[in-house]
UniProtKB/Swiss-Prot annotation:
NCBIfam families: rplP_bact. GO terms for molecular function: rRNA binding; structural constituent of ribosome. One of its GO terms (cellular component) is mitochondrial large ribosomal subunit. It comes from Thalassiosira pseudonana. Disulfide bonds: none annotated. SUPFAM superfamilies: Ribosomal protein L16p/L10e. Part of the 50S ribosomal subunit. Belongs to the universal ribosomal protein uL16 family. CDD domains: Ribosomal_L16_L10e (cd01433). GO terms for biological process: mitochondrial translation. This is Large ribosomal subunit protein uL16c.
Length: 137
């Protein structure tokens, strides 16, 4: 599972996701990309499950880039605990994703294989996604 080695703060505010992604919204490493169409938090477990699905389908013949990183903590209280006494313990890590963010990139495989791999990978994610092809400059 992905998580930062160290952070400035242990616990974060939830914040809110407004607008579209202005950075990380173009395919820059691979030839094909998986783009988010909705705002959401994507957990490190979901990222790992998606990565495994893509690598298994491509039989490890593809180069894969994970363009998001879970750098925000989500806290949870113990079950049946009373209110008060501070914020709960860190439960898991999430990546904040806005619409337009490129989640994964892939290269060194045919377009049909990449499309099928990303289609399978999309089932592991809690958001709608879109397959995109790199625009050559």
């Amino acid at each position: 599972m992905l998580s930062p080695k160290r952070t400035k703060y242990r616990k974060y505010h939830r914040g809110r996701m407004r607008g579209k992604a202005t950075r990380g919204n173009e395919v820059s490493f691979g030839k094909y990309g998986l783009q988010a169409l909705e705002p959401s938090w994507i957990t490190s477990r979901q990222i790992e499950a998606t990565r495994r699905t893509i690598t298994r389908y491509t039989k490890r013949g593809a180069s894969l880039w994970i363009r998001i990183f879970p750098d925000k903590t989500v806290t949870a209280r113990a079950a049946e605990s009373r209110m008060g006494s501070g914020k709960g313990a860190v439960d898991y890590w999430v990546a904040t994703v806005k619409p337009g963010t490129i989640l994964f990139e892939i290269s060194a495989v045919p377009e049909e294989v990449a499309r099928a791999a990303f289609n399978l990978a999309a089932y592991k994610l809690p958001i709608k996604t879109k397959f995109i092809i790199r625009k050559d400059i």
